[in-house]
Structure formats: structure tokens, C-alpha cells
Amino acid sequence: MHRYRSHTCEELRPSDVGGTVRLSGWVHRVRDHGGLLFIDLRDHYGITQIVADPDSPSFSTAEKLRSEWVIRVDGEVKARTPETVNPNLATGGVEVFAREIEVLSQAKELPLPVFGEPDYPEDIRLKYRFLDLRRETLHRNILARTKIIAEMRKRMAESGFTEFSTPILTASSPEGARDFLVPSRLHQGKFYALPQAPQIYKQLIMVSGFDRYFQIAPCFRDEDPRADRLPGEFYQLDLEMSFVTQEDVFSTMEPVMRGIFEAFAEGKPVTQKLPRIPYDEAMRKYGSDKPDLRNPIVMEEVSEHFRGSGFKVFANILANDPKAEVWAIPAKTGGSRAFCDRMNSWAQGEGQPGLGYIFWRKEGDTLEGAGPIAKNIGPERTDAIRTQLGLGDGDACFFVAGDPKKFVAFAGAARTRAGEELNLVDRDRFELAWIVDFPFYEWNEDEKRIEFGHNPFSMPQGGMEALENQEPLSIKAFQYDLVCNGFEIASGGIRNHMPELMVKAFEVAGFDRQMVEERFGGLYRAFQYGAPPHGGMAAGIDRIVMLLRGAKNLREITMFPMNQQAMDLLMGAPSEATPQQLRELHIRLAPKQD
């Protein structure tokens, strides 16, 4: 028999009754029932119940066992009595009567419980991550992550993609975040950078004559902590394709992404035909470029109903600013003053003056609008708003007014808040959609200049003619995002593969040819030797796993994450370098600032 086990702790079934087995694992818990000791023995695969009775030579050892000791058990498989069968365990029909127990490793008193999953301070969980990972939910999440990545690889290979690895030590490039810099020992005063994404390398792979590339790529960004992104590093399914249009990317990747969700959705419906929603439409209807389409609320413009009306606040805003609009946020079933007042208080907590509203209720046989706005604009305008929005008895509507560019984010947040408060969001499905036609440029109000809206390497719609003749802020990009349930899970574009077009695009954003040649010399040179039209995308693996597992944050699906202060509490990183290490790197530390 094997030194440690003949079976795993998940394998034994009633068909094994009568056999002698050897199991090894962790002591999950010990229970004393009238002199009999019941030990739940756990390994990577599952749990088996061990029984030690006072007549067994193993009993004296069993009495000493404590949680998370590692033991080996030899014993006989017996059937449980009908009343003791545990239907929640794969091995719940049997138990092993111990003949011999060997302690392989003892455990100190635990700093956090492994049995059960009570809430525990996150810093303790991260410091003792090796214990935290023994807990059932986290253990399953990590295994699911591995299976999801394996499914990605399988589907990409089936779609004709080849997996390539790109360098981890590379040159710094402006991708929208700070680089992690690595000092060079051999080249004094110079630094490598960890890649924020394999963007330039994957385009060079296309120029090199390969047709379809992908990799499970680690990406590194020195960003301030955010709730929806792990500090330091994250992983993405990165891909690129030659000789493709935007629709080619969609038709290739839609079955892959939909299939991954279907494989791990545990029966929840997944969007079959993904809609293409223009960016401007997404902002107008949902107040977000990553809308949660499970929320049925669709915002509409209702400016005409307020122009010249008795509600002077909105009427004056419209009269004094040609850019001003009034948007309506319809809220079916929200027609109570208590709910409307809660929404108004929430808006004030968000730094807004309030949130105007109308709600409708039956007064006898008449459907009437209620609230300050309804009183000021009168029944005819109130009813016109209700008719436009398709609302009725027991429904409500909220309003925001001003320059849409300034209030759109708040309007989107109000839509989300109303949908959640009214339980309008169906949480048992995955709603996927493509967001397309992103602005190529945007206006930086702080610096008073035009800058790239998203990826500077995307192809502008209209090409050189658009760059030379169109107002820059009106130019759209062949840029797209894949969104799911309010999260951006992938982003991509058709690339600008022509060197002069690339230079012109950067010139519009205020950069000259010399800067392009210096910062992107490898790509710029490559484009001068025959570059194919190409495009691709990158999907955030961490977010996809989080969504599929229903995890509350990204740390719940990552094996060894940092905390929100970008510290690895388990390994003690970042740490100070030794004087010798600093000398070899030609680095002298400046005095710490108070």
C-alpha cells in the first residue's frame, strides 16, 4: 500500500464497504459522541468521516488530535446506518473505522478558523493565506479559476489561436497608469518596466506574420487601490488577429466568451445574441459605458416637457444653457413618497442638491401625478411625461437637469440605485453586450487639451480624412468593450497599422513625430515594413472569475493577493533592499520625507 494513501478523502463509496484503506489529510473537526470519536478528515478533494472507538489501538492517538493536524489513517470501510447517512457529502454513505492513526504534522493554535466560514479581519486572512485557502469557498474559487482558464485555452485553440509568451522585462510605455520600474544592474541609470499589457508585442507578432495570437498574460500597473481592480498585478486573456474587421473579432470571440460563461454559469441564463450598443447610446440610456442590462430602467430626455414650464428651476436651466437637457429616470413600482424621499436623501448624500420626482397614484378613477414637480408643471405636462415613459399607477420618475456631460455619471448612479432599491435587477442571469463607437479623443478640462479617449493605437473611423477634416472630439474609434452585469470584462479595437496615420493621430493629441519615434520606435519601424490590418482585445480574467463565482471582491478569487494598500502581508512585500543590493544597482536612497 502507498506510504500515505490508497484513496483520496472524496473517493470512497458504498461499493468500497469491507475494504481496508489508507487516507491522509487534515483534521477538519473532532466530535465526541458517547465515547466514540468522529473525525472529519479533509484533503484537496473532499471529506471522509473517520470513527475511532475505545477498543481500537488508534483511540489513544485520536484523543490527542486537534484541528488542522495532518494525519494518516488506516482502517476498514463500513456502511453508515440509514439515519446517519450524510447526503451533503460525496462520501456520506460510508465511514472508516480507524485501526491505526499516524500524526504526520501538528498545527499550532489557529489564528483564524478553517472549519466554517465566519467573517474574519481581512489582514489576518491575508497574513495566514495558507490557512484561509483551506476554507471551502475560497478553495473552490481557486479551483474554478484554474478550470475557467483551462476552458479559455481550449476554446482559443479550437478557434485557431496559437499561444505565445511575451517579455516581462520591457520598456516603459504610456498606457494610462504608472509603470513598475526595474533598475538595470548592467546599464547604470536605466530601467526596465513590467508590462502594463502586451499591447505592442502582440501587434508586433501580427507584423511578424503570425495570424492569431493569445496568451494568459500577467499585467502590472502601479495604480492607487480601486474596488474593482487588484493592486499591482492582474491577468487577462490577451489576443490579436490579422486581416480582420471589427465584426470579425466579434464573430470569433462572441462564441468563446459566451461559451465560457455558459460552462460555468451553473444554469443561469447567458445572453445568446450580444447586442452592439454605441457608446453615445449607452451613456444616454444608462449613464454608463458599462451598463448593467439586468436593470430594466432606460433613461430618456424629457426637456420639452419642462421648457417654459412652471417648474422654474428646470425651465431656467434650459433657457440659459443651450447644452442643457432634462433626463428622466423612470422607476416602475417606485410610486411612494417614502421611496422618493429616500432617493432624494441619497442624492444629497452624493453631493447633489436633491433629486426631483413625480409619482403617480389613482385618486378615484383619475390617475394623478404627485410631488412638487407635478404641482408646478401642471397635469397636462405631467401626463405627457407619464405617457412618453410608459408609466402608470404606482410608478415614479426622477429627473436631473443641466449639461449631460456633467450629470451623466450621477444619473447613471441614480438609475443603478433605483433598480437595486426596487429589486428590479435579476441577479440570476448574465447579460453580455458589446459597447462600440467610443470617442477617439476626449477633452481634458484640467489641462485644457485634447487627449486620447482610450487606446491610442486604435484605428480612427474615417482614417486620415477624419483626422485632417473632422472636429477631433467628433471622431469615433474602432474601439469596443465587452460588458457584463455592470462590469467591463474585455476591451479591444482594430489597430492603426499605417505609420503616417499613427503619427497624425498623435499629432492631433499634441505629440510630434519625434515623440512617436522615441516612445514607440519598435512598433513605428515595424509598420514601415508591411503591417497587416489587425485587431484584438483583452479580457480581464479576474473580473470574469469574480462574476461567475459570485464573489464579493477580487481577493476572493485570487490565490495570494495584496491588500488594498498594495502590501503582501504573507511574504512581507514590499521590503527594504540591502545596502549591497542598492550598490550593485547604483541606487542611493533619498532621505525619507516627513
UniProtKB/Swiss-Prot annotation:
Top class in the EC scheme: ligase
Chain positions covered by the region annotation Aspartate: 199-202
Predominant place of localization: cytoplasm
An annotated GO BP: aspartyl-tRNA aminoacylation
EC number of the protein: 6.1.1.23
InterPro entries: Aa-tRNA-synt_II, aa-tRNA-synth_II, aa-tRNA-synth_II/BPL/LPL, Asp-tRNA-ligase_1, Asp-tRNA-ligase_1_N, Asp/Asn-tRNA-synth_IIb, AspRS_core, GAD-like_sf
List of residues binding L-aspartate: E175, R221, H454, R495
The keyword ATP-binding is assigned to this record: yes
Positions contributing to ATP binding: R221, D222, E223, E488, G540, I541, D542, R543
GO molecular function, one term: ATP binding
Swiss-Prot/TrEMBL catalytic activity: tRNA(Asx) + L-aspartate + ATP = L-aspartyl-tRNA(Asx) + AMP + diphosphate
Keyword Nucleotide-binding: yes
Record-linked Gene3D superfamilies: Bira Bifunctional Protein, Domain 2, GAD-like domain, Nucleic acid-binding proteins
Site (Important for tRNA non-discrimination) location in chain: H33
GO cellular component: cytoplasm
Subcellular location per the Swiss-Prot or TrEMBL entry: Cytoplasm
PROSITE patterns reported for this sequence: AA_TRNA_LIGASE_II (PS50862)
Alphabetic keyword roster: Aminoacyl-tRNA synthetase, ATP-binding, Cytoplasm, Ligase, Nucleotide-binding, Protein biosynthesis
Entry superkingdom: Bacteria
Quaternary structure annotation from Swiss-Prot or TrEMBL: Homodimer.
Family classification: Belongs to the class-II aminoacyl-tRNA synthetase family. Type 1 subfamily.
Function: Aspartyl-tRNA synthetase with relaxed tRNA specificity since it is able to aspartylate not only its cognate tRNA(Asp) but also tRNA(Asn). Reaction proceeds in two steps: L-aspartate is first activated by ATP to form Asp-AMP and then transferred to the acceptor end of tRNA(Asp/Asn).
Listed name of the protein: Aspartate--tRNA(Asp/Asn) ligase
